[in-house]
Amino acid sequence: MLKITKLVRSWWADFKHIPKIDRVWLSTWLIIYITFIMLDVLTPTFWGSSLLKYAGIFLCVIYAYKKYYDDSKLIIALFLTFLADTILVWTHYYTVGVFVFCFAQFMHFLRQTTLSKRNLGIFALVISGLTFYNAWSGGVLIYSLGGLYAMLLIANVVLASRRYKREQKDFKARCGWYGFMLFIACDLCVGLRYIMLDGLISARSLPLVAFLVWVFYYPSQVFIANSSTHKESAKGRNIAKSKAIS
């Protein structure tokens, strides 16, 4: 109970330090989040829920572009996430969608790691080589890509956790840790959903698991959009000042 109380106090302390413009963004994100959760509960098949989710992910890209204009890796990672969602939500090219998600996770890895370019290149070649060798030798490509995605996500969780331990008072470091923990919770639900659909375990809880995917996923992207390793750009500061004056 004490840990929960401490966590809530930490969240409240974070909220008090959010500039006015960020509170406007936060309110927008919360409205979208609460609305699509209510729609999923009351009318699970309504297409408007998917549209709201899609718009919410796109807003994360816009937010990062405005606030952290100089952090190109974060912006690209969020845009690739949005692109992957576009492919997975609106098309049947699931393998392509997972492939784009792998690139998104790799961009997050790039922005968090301290590896040299040489070691980073070796890492990328080894991981990619193992993945495509598995697919070429008879494995199913989407499963190989899923394995690559899982390795990159776990690496990002580890890097975010290390950053959080180093910089516990840094709001952005905490956002990164919260974001990637929620991300992995989301993907555990995705994995469980596919296991249920394949008939390996009972599908009795399938609607709940499918619901939880977005309960975890959407806030993960909001937190990650606030986890830049860069300082707020001059462009973002100028926007915040103009909003505060008005």
Regions from the PLM with identified roles:
Residues 2-246:
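Polytopic alpha-helical membrane-helix bundles and their juxtamembrane interface segments
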